[in-house]
Swiss-Prot record:
Belongs to the small GTPase superfamily. Rab family. It is a lipid-anchor. A motif (Switch 2) lies at residues 55-72. SUPFAM superfamilies: P-loop containing nucleoside triphosphate hydrolases. Gene3D superfamilies: P-loop containing nucleotide triphosphate hydrolases. This is Ras-related protein Rab-20.
């Protein structure tokens, strides 16, 4: 198996839909019931690069494994449920600390899933026009008002950049990195992953260039062979 060129990791509390998001994108289906034990991953070829996407368990007993899966990650998808504010708070309280093992220039996406269960948006049409934005659809009486607003995710994103001591001017804008999705309908799922792929690829190329510059030509550094001079009798 070819070694991945980059890594993306999904983090978040249990039941926010991390596995469903990944399976919706990779397998084009919505699983009825699924629970990740420990971790699982897919390989996605994007352009000429191989990117691994890691799904992690949100259960407390598997919490410590998160930092292991985040090691060397180029991007982290922090996932919450738009209908449960506590799942957004948990990202900062429980999961942000697990990202210490990620790359120093790691990207962060804040993703509010299960937007199909709210009364504020029509998500039946699949992909829409952009992250953290969308046209207001007709209200459905069986749905509930959204409990977490896009501006809450934007605030968390900016807080993460400060926590990581990353220059906000050098990182993608919050509006580009905060998404609302529905794994059930596919709303914004392709947009989420492919936005990250397009951002991660230049990072991979830059890392390869830096590694190439640091490569030393051992042959050119060999000490010239000395010849022993002899004495004439």
């Amino acid at each position: 198996m070819r070694k991945p060129d980059g890594k993306i990791v999904l983090l978040g509390d249990m039941n926010v839909g991390k596995t469903s998001l990944l399976q919706r994108y990779m397998e084009r289906r919505f699983p009825d019931t699924v629970s990740t034990v420990g971790g699982a991953f897919y390989l996605k070829q994007w352009r000429s690069f191989n990117i691994s996407i890691w799904d992690t368990a949100g259960r407390e007993q598997f919490h410590g494994l998160g930092s292991l899966y985040c090691r060397g990650a180029a991007a982290i998808i922090l996932t919450y449920d738009v209908n449960h504010p506590q799942s957004l708070f948990e990202l900062e309280d429980r999961f942000l600390g697990l990202t210490e093992t990620a790359n120093n220039d790691c990207l962060f996406a804040i993703v509010g899933n299960k937007v199909d269960l709210t009364s504020e948006r029509d998500t039946e049409g699949g992909e829409k026009e952009g992250p953290a934005s969308g046209k207001v659809g007709s209200c459905v009486s069986t749905k509930v008002p959204k409990q977490v607003q896009p501006e809450d995710a934007v605030a968390l994103y900016k807080k993460i950049l400060k926590y990581k001591m990353l220059d906000e001017r050098e990182m993608p804008a919050a509006e580009q990195m905060c998404f609302e999705t529905s794994a059930k309908t596919g709303y914004n799922v392709d947009l989420l992953f492919e936005t990250l792929f397009d951002l991660v690829v230049p990072m991979i190329m830059r890392q390869r260039a830096e590694e190439s510059d640091q490569t030393v030509d051992i042959a050119s550094c060999k000490t010239p062979k000395q010849t022993r001079s002899g004495c004439c009798a």
